[in-house]
Amino acid sequence: MPRFGAHMSISGGVSKSFARGESVGLDAMQIFAKNERQWTAKPISAEEMAAFQAEQQRTGIHPVIVHDSYLINLAAPADDLREKSIVAFADELERCAQLKIPYLVTHPGAHTGIGEEAGLVRVADAISRLLAEGVGGTTMILLETTAGQGTALGYRFEHLARLFELIPYHDRLGVCVDTCHIFAAGYDIRDPDTYDATFAELDRLVGLERVKCFHLNDSQKDLGSRVDRHAHIGQGCIGTEAFRLLVNDPRFAHLPMIIETPKGEDMAEDRMNLALLRSLVRITAA
C-alpha cells in the first residue's frame, strides 16, 4: 500500500508537525522547512533537530518531504533574483540535510519571457552548481510537475526530460507527480486507457523509476486549463476513478502519496480525503 500523507503546518517549530500528522493518521508527511513566504529564516537549532528526530521516531511517520519556498525561481532571467533564489534553495537543501529529510520538492520555476529552453538551461545550471558542491548531502531534489500557469516550466514531461539531460547528478534528482497539475496541463488520467497512456508517456520521456513521490489532488478546473486549483479527492474534474487506478498501481505501491487539498484548522478535510484514498486500495493476498 502507498504511504499516504498530507502537508502539515510547522507552526511552533518543525518538530510540532509530527503531532499534527499523528492526529490525522499520516503514514508520510510534507512540510516547509521554514516560513515559505520569507527569503531567510533563523538556523534550525540543535535542540529542534533533536526534537524532530525524536518525534519522527515516536510517531513512525516517514518519509518526511520538504517543499521549498514559493519565492524561489531558479529560471529567473534577472540575475539578482536568480542568485537570491539559488542562495535560498541551497539553504532549503541544507535544512533538509540537517533534519535527515530524503526529498526536497521544487517547482522548476518560471521563465518570465525568455523562453522555455532558456529557462530550463538556467534551472539546470543552478541545480548543477549546487549539486557539484555537494550542497544538501544526500537529499534528493524532486522536480514537480506543474499546471503550466503563466510562464511556469515543468508542465510538459519533455521539460523534465530536458532537465535530466542537462543535470548530470541523477543520483540526487527525481520527480514528484502532482495529479491536479498534470491534468490541468493536459494529461488525462480519468479512465484506464488515458491513465495508461499518460504514464507510458512519462515512462518513455523520463522513466517511472525516477518518480519518488505523488501529490494527490483533484482539480477544480478542467483538462488542459493550465490553471492550478486543487479540489478534494473525487470532488473535482478528475474524479475518483483516476485515484483508484493510481493507489492500486503496483509500480507505485510503496511511494509516498501526499494530499494538498483545501482544509481548515481542525484538518477534518484531511481525514476525509485520506479515508477515501485508503478505501480505494484493493487489499490483495501477499
Swiss-Prot record:
Keyword vocabulary terms for this entry: DNA damage, DNA repair, Endonuclease, Hydrolase, Metal-binding, Nuclease, Zinc
An example Gene Ontology molecular-function term: DNA binding
GO biological process: base-excision repair
SMART domains, alphabetized: AP2Ec
UniProt-recorded name of the protein: Probable endonuclease 4
Family from the record: Belongs to the AP endonuclease 2 family.
Catalytically driven reaction(s): Endonucleolytic cleavage to 5'-phosphooligonucleotide end-products
UniProt function note: Endonuclease IV plays a role in DNA repair. It cleaves phosphodiester bonds at apurinic or apyrimidinic (AP) sites, generating a 3'-hydroxyl group and a 5'-terminal sugar phosphate.
Ribosomal protein among keywords: no
Amino acids binding Zn(2+) 3: 181, 228, 230
InterPro entries: AP_endonuc_2, AP_endonuc_F2_Zn_BS, Xyl_isomerase-like_sf, Xyl_isomerase-like_TIM-brl
Binding locations of Zn(2+) 1: 67, 107, 144
Cofactor remark: Binds 3 Zn(2+) ions.
Keyword Nucleus: no
EC top class, as a word: hydrolase
Binding residue positions for Zn(2+) 2: 144, 178, 215, 260
EC annotation from Swiss-Prot or TrEMBL: 3.1.21.2
Cofactor: Zn(2+)
